[in-house]
């Protein structure tokens, strides 16, 4: 759902509500009726501190060799959420190439673009100029803020922060993306309707919690617990 620079998305990782004007967002576990709220710019630090707390609790009574193993895993996560230096961004040459290929996706004509990083094809995007989102969503700001909370996997965070990549939002809304691992994300349906402001707010019976508690619930769900209450919806 998108309206007045508010965005709501739901998936396997939970429910996200983004407020571009306040540069804040909400991450909710609806089955547990809990949520975390914070600023885009503070998420990486908050995530790091929460994960550090959880790992510390988990490893405190483990043998030394297992502590080393988990600390190594933790360091890899730290690296994924560490903001790269400007020199790292500048060292990557990002080039956007337009093509003459078009395709209808969810009823909208979409043009294919290719993203090359240091001469290597890293991503393909199908972008539609036919969806009138400009009055409801600042696409460039949304893309930049989303980059603040996404992990830096295989250099994605770096090139997605380049001016050439962010300027691609001027071409329209991304209807399909395929990365260099073949992972595809695609829009399957577009509807235009008036959305109540309350749809972008947490219900009164939801409890605000720390990010560490929300992560614990996510880890419980991914560990294979079969109960509905302990899994992400």
Feature locations, PLM:
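Extended soluble regions of mature proteins
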Residues: 1-233
């Amino acid at each position: 759902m998108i309206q007045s620079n508010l965005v709501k998305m739901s998936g396997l990782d939970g429910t996200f509500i983004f407020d571009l004007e306040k540069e804040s967002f909400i991450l909710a576990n609806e089955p547990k009726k809990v949520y975390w709220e914070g600023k885009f710019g503070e998420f990486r630090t908050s995530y790091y501190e929460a994960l550090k707390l959880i790992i510390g609790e988990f490893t405190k009574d483990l043998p030394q060799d297992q502590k080393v193993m988990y600390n190594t895993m933790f360091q890899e996560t730290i690296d994924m959420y560490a903001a790269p230096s400007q020199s790292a961004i500048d060292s990557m040459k990002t080039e956007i190439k337009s093509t003459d290929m078009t395709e209808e996706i969810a009823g909208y004509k979409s043009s294919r673009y290719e993203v090359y990083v240091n001469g290597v094809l890293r991503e393909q995007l199908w972008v539609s100029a036919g969806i009138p989102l400009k009055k409801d969503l600042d696409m460039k700001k949304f893309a930049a803020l989303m980059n603040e909370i996404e992990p830096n996997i295989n250099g994605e965070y770096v090139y997605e922060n380049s001016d050439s990549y962010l300027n691609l939002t001027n071409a329209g809304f991304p209807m399909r993306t395929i990365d260099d691992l073949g992972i595809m994300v695609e829009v399957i349906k577009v509807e235009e309707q008036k959305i109540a402001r309350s749809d972008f707010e947490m219900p009164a019976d939801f409890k605000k919690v720390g990010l560490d508690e929300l992560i614990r619930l996510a880890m419980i769900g991914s560990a294979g617990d079969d109960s509905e209450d302990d899994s992400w919806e």
